[in-house]
A protein has these predicted regions:
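Residue-level signal for mature regions of secreted extracellular proteins and peptides
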Residues: 10-13
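Start-of-domain marker
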Residues: 22-80
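Bacterial N-terminal signal peptides that target proteins for export
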Residues: 1-8
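A generic structural micro-environment signature
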Residues: 7, 26, 32-34, 195, ...
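Mature, soluble, non-transmembrane domains
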Residues: 73-237
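C-terminal motif of bacterial Sec signal peptides marking the signal peptidase cleavage site
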Residues: 18-19
């Protein structure tokens, strides 16, 4: 349970930051590898502020990505994950496409799929995220540490207080963007979903793709996600 959520972490983490276009797409299949595609495109304000802070901490140069594509690919490959594409865009932009064996141990605590019962459960928790972050290259972890989010630190901070913390550290404009931002996750499952729910925060809507497949669109307010100290769980049955 390391890389998939590390990605869902790096995305749900990084991406999770503030005003940006961030999406993740998981495809659950019967008898085949699961697919994962994710993309994070930061707002110009976010990239400008984070880049400025990184330049103060290190020898970071304009346009240089905070991620190392080769290191990320090697980390995924080491975990038995097939990487189709990793694209770096500017300093913070990231897009990747990969497939994960459905029996891979990294899926156990993140995605639970019962083929017989036709039920899927997705879980996001601080414990899951921490274990994922440990595998990231140091540079990526340094960037994530700058967010100071309860989801990563385990410290209980109310959303309003965390918003104030971000405002004091990175400016009121970024804090305002964070207040209105969402993380969007699309999940395709190989069965027709009758009921879907998410708790304790967020919304989930279901679309029927075919008579035998469904797609769930999950939206979670970033403030709620970043301040999670318990578990966010999505059930589709």
């Amino acid at each position: 349970m390391k890389i998939l959520c590390r990605i869902l972490s790096c995305l749900a983490t990084v991406c999770i930051t503030v005003a940006c276009s961030s999406t993740a797409h998981i495809v659950i299949r019967d008898g085949a590898d699961y697919g994962l595609t994710a993309e994070f495109i930061p707002s110009s304000l976010l990239e400008k502020n984070i880049t400025h802070l990184l330049k103060q901490k290190s020898e970071h140069t304009d346009g240089q990505s905070v991620f190392n594509g080769q290191e990320l690919k090697e980390a995924f490959t080491k975990e038995g994950i097939s990487v189709q594409d990793i694209t770096l865009q500017g300093a913070l932009g990231l897009r990747f496409v990969c497939t994960v064996p459905q029996t891979h141990e990294l899926l156990e605590d993140v995605i639970g799929y019962d083929k017989k019962e036709r039920k899927a459960v997705l879980r996001i928790s601080p414990e899951n995220i921490v274990s994922f972050l440990e595998i990231l290259p140091q540079e990526s972890r340094d960037f994530i540490d700058m967010l100071m989010a309860p989801l990563f630190t385990g410290d209980a901070i109310p959303p309003a207080e965390y918003e104030e913390l971000i405002g004091a550290a990175y400016g009121k404009k970024i804090a305002a963007e964070l207040r209105n931002a969402e993380f969007t996750l699309t999940v395709d499952v190989p069965y027709k979903v009758q009921t879907a729910r998410i708790s304790p925060a967020g919304t989930v809507t279901v679309q029927t793709k075919t008579e035998k497949t469904s797609r769930a669109l999950i939206r979670i307010p970033l403030l709620e996600l970043l301040c999670t100290v318990g578990m966010i769980e999505v059930q589709m049955q």
